């Protein structure tokens, strides 16, 4: 938590003073995102003061992630980098340069930002559609696997019934063959009865 009190703290500052200084620096560094404010500072000669230039160098600690997360206007870090160059500090005193920067910022918000949001939405929609297609394909593959298992299951029953029918036909075919050995005996009995009847007829 001590980091939020800013860098460059000394032993003379109390914790309350450090916190207040951190809040002041947070507010000031975010004001740098306004080109009109930069033009105001340039026209007042602040950018010619070496102590103020050193202060701008000191404020670069806001670029660190531990501090940048508190910024509501991160565009200020871009202008903070530009202010490190003497050429930019000299040109920003011109009102036309300030107006050009302001117009470019407005154009970015009106067009680029909206286009970027639309691109992000399109990419998100495409990813969602791809995920849905993958899910549908997985479901279709699962249904095909289940259908294939059901169609393959009756095969043993068909083979079993066919083998049963074959065994029945085989047994029915064997029955006459088994009955054939008894035919000669029956034939002999029939022949014996017929010969006995003939003898009786002759005696009469």
Swiss-Prot record:
InterPro entries: Med31_sf, Mediator_Med31
Record GO biological process: anterior/posterior axis specification, embryo; positive regulation of DNA-templated transcription; regulation of transcription by RNA polymerase II
Pfam families, alphabetized: Med31
Record key words, sorted: Activator, Nucleus, Transcription, Transcription regulation
Locations listed in the record: Nucleus
Listed PANTHER family: MEDIATOR OF RNA POLYMERASE II TRANSCRIPTION SUBUNIT 31
Subunit-level organization: Component of the Mediator complex, which includes at least MED4, MED6, MED14, MED17, MED18, MED20, MED21, MED23, MED24, MED27, MED30 and MED31.
Name this protein carries in UniProt: Mediator of RNA polymerase II transcription subunit 31
UniProt source species: Drosophila melanogaster
Lineage: Eukaryota, Metazoa, Ecdysozoa, Arthropoda, Hexapoda
Gene that encodes the chain: MED31
């Amino acid at each position: 938590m001590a980091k939020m009190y800013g860098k460059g703290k000394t032993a003379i500052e109390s914790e309350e003073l450090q916190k207040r200084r951190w809040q002041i620096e947070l507010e000031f560094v975010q004001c740098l995102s306004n080109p009109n404010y930069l033009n105001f500072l340039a026209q007042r000669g602040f950018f010619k003061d070496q102590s103020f230039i050193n202060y701008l160098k000191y404020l670069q600690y806001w670029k660190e992630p531990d501090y940048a997360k508190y910024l509501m206007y991160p565009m200020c870090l871009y202008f903070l980098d530009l202010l490190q160059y003497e050429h930019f500090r000299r040109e920003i005193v011109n009102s036309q340069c300030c107006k050009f920067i302001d117009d470019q910022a407005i154009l970015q918000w009106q067009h680029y930002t909206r286009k970027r949001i639309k691109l992000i939405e399109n990419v998100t929609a495409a990813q969602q559609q791809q995920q849905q297609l993958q899910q549908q394909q997985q479901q279709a593959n699962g249904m095909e696997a289940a259908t294939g298992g059901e169609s393959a299951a009756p095969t043993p029953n068909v083979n079993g019934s066919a083998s049963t029918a074959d065994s029945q036909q085989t047994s029915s075919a064997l029955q006459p063959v088994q009955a054939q050995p008894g035919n000669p005996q029956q034939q002999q009995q029939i022949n014996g009865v017929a010969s006995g009847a003939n003898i009786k007829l002759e005696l009469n």
